[in-house]
A protein has these predicted regions:
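Glycine-/acidic-rich phosphate or pyrophosphate-binding loops and their flanking alpha/beta elements
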Residues: 24-49, 80-83, 104
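Fold-independent oxyanion-binding glycine-rich loops
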Residues: 8-9, 35, 50-53, 74, ...
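Flexible gly/pro-rich beta->alpha loop and the following alpha-helix that scaffold active-site loops
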Residues: 55-109
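Serine/threonine-rich low-complexity intrinsically disordered regions
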Residues: 7, 12, 40, 77, ...
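Internal gly/pro-rich beta-alpha loop/helix module
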Residues: 1-37
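Short coil/turn connectors at secondary-structure junctions
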Residues: 1-2, 42-45, 67, 85-86
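Phosphate-binding glycine-rich loops and adjacent basic patches that engage nucleotide phosphates
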Residues: 18-26, 41-43, 66-75
Length: 109
């Protein structure tokens, strides 16, 4: 669902509405992912978090529960994540249309 915040009162809703409905941002996963691997040290389970636009709270919540959290950029190769021998792999939520992430989805599979 798209929306608009404006202070203007003099706009034509009939003119703007089709533009709002057609608006579809691209490249948002790569624009929001971390740029390099981040580690939140812990003594519990070792979790790999693939950052597809993750909110900071996701990694923090796992870390707070004792997990070692390795946060990886969205374009990280599967072999690099698996080489760290994680106990589990988590895919974060993120912005945009998943259909745009064909290479990431292929790598995950």
């Amino acid at each position: 669902m798209n929306g608009m915040i404006t202070r203007r009162e003099d706009f034509d809703l009939e003119e703007i509405l089709p533009k709002l409905k057609a608006y579809s941002p691209t490249g948002v996963v790569m624009a929001t992912t971390c740029k390099e691997r981040e580690v939140l040290p812990g003594d519990g389970y070792k979790v790999a978090l693939l950052d597809l636009g993750a909110k900071k709270n996701i990694g923090d919540s796992l870390h707070k529960r004792g997990c070692e959290v390795n946060i990886y950029p969205a374009d990280t190769k599967a072999e690099d994540i698996l080489a760290a021998n994680p106990d589990g792999i988590m895919l974060s939520n993120g912005p945009g249309d998943p259909k745009e992430c064909t290479e990431i989805i292929k790598e995950i599979k």
